[in-house]
Amino acid sequence: AKNSYKNCHAGGVYSIVLASRGDRLQRMFFADSIHELYKNSPWEASECNVPMSVGFHGHHCDIAITGLMGHIVNWEIENDIQGRLHLDEYLYSSGILNKNGCFVWTGQERTFRDKARVIITEGGRVEMSAIELHTIYVKGGSRAAWLVEEGEPANRVSYTYSNADLEKLNFDKLYHTVSESEILAIARLLISNDGGAI
């Protein structure tokens, strides 16, 4: 289970490495029923009513997202000085890459507007460039799984934009090693697709 984690980016989310080619990973994400991705609702976070669990972020490479089970919403935003979405800018050091993730506020607030809200179901696919900003929403209490395939690495500084105070995020609760038994339980759940408990 090397480089596979539970509570990855947010509570109740698993990241399982399926394949690796050099710096390029193929990972499966699984949101258990206790996940916190419901806090990224485009219909609530856009009004700043609920602090997001995963801020809008780009990646160190181009990615492709493919739905495996359930429904996810890939919510993308873009810069717009007249946009109504006001978010703080944070410099991000990945907990996946170095296991010591942290956010530092840059002192800047940025303004954005919606670019896309794409519902991804089983077999659905979205491709994104490294510079595109997104977050993932899953309905509270439901389970979902999706595949993320990485493209060529890009040299870029990674920022995250959020309506939550990310400097106060407790990383001790995130990026825990996932056991082989947990991975097998997730695999059985995906095969049966019955939404049973992990």
What are these regions (language model features)?
Residues A1, Q26-H57, W75-I81, I120, ...:
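Conserved short histidine dyad/triad with adjacent acidic residue
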Residues A1-G22:
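N-terminal, Lys/Arg-enriched amphipathic/low-complexity engagement segments
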Residues H57-N74, E78, E149:
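Short, conserved beta-strand element in jelly-roll/cupin
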Residues E76-A130:
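Short acidic-glycine-tyrosine-enriched beta hairpin
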Residues E132-T135:
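Short, charged beta-turn/beta-strand-edge "cap" motif at the junction between a beta-strand
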Residues Y137-G140:
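Asparagine-centered strand-capping/turn motif at beta-strand->loop junctions
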Residues S142-S158:
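A short hydrophobic beta-strand segment most commonly corresponding to one strand
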Residues N155-I198:
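Long, compositionally biased interface segments
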